[in-house]
């Protein structure tokens, strides 16, 4: 247990919902509506509140828009399951609803960064600048594992996914987050636990994402297809690299070879950070992002 007080946001997010292809999508918005827009896309098993710490560190005013992806946070779950390509279509709808007709800067972490990068390649007219936080494509799946992979996918659909573990208190959930990332401070963990959880009918707490997200996508990753999208990106791009060692570095050329696919990219490593670099060093991440957004 802990007697630490939860992190108190300096800038307050306002919640609203937009229709997203038949689902009710929850969106957090910070800052004046007439300020420069900035769209932030969260990663797997997370929600838009994950960006609160960097939003609080921005020196300038931005109209920050952070949707919860389908099946995450306060956005509706999809009983038919999830395909990665859904995120691209969902993002297109959210942009048309909230910032129609203009190219906007988009930043994404992990899965959200993967979606942002691919979207920037297939809809370049909608992205003015692109920021990827530890999101530089995946390592190719082993084709020989495809039969077992698809067998698992079928089994989960027939038997149901592993259900979320129940917790009695937010403090227990916060402690779980700290166990996963030892750099995360308890005050931030308590904030994230409160924003990323929901209460069950029996009064216990659970993480607010659809357990179906634990199922694998039905289509395995293909690096060549990802690379083709990267080569279509027109927007100036910033890759923010965490301090962890990535599997990508085991490839020939490592991260540099992947970065070379993008026409106009700058890579910046944020030392002494985990995959969640926006939690570990939010002031530095915000400073680097803001300098990039304001350049040119």
Regions found by a protein language model. Name each.
Residues 26-77:
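Conserved HGGG/HGGXW glycine-rich cap/lid loop of the alpha/beta-hydrolase fold
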Residues 133-166:
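A catalytic-pocket lid/entrance helix-loop region that shapes and gates access to the active site
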Residues 101-146:
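Conserved hydrolase catalytic core segment
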Residues 232-273:
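Conserved loop-alpha-helix segment in the C-terminal half of the alpha/beta-hydrolase fold
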Residues 88-103:
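Conserved acidic catalytic loop of the alpha/beta-hydrolase fold
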Residues 161-220, 229:
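Conserved alpha/beta-hydrolase catalytic His-Asp/Glu region
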Residues 273-282, 286:
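Catalytic histidine-centered segment of alpha/beta-hydrolase-like enzymes
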Residues 1-38, 59-62, 99-102, 137, ...:
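Alpha/beta-hydrolase fold catalytic core
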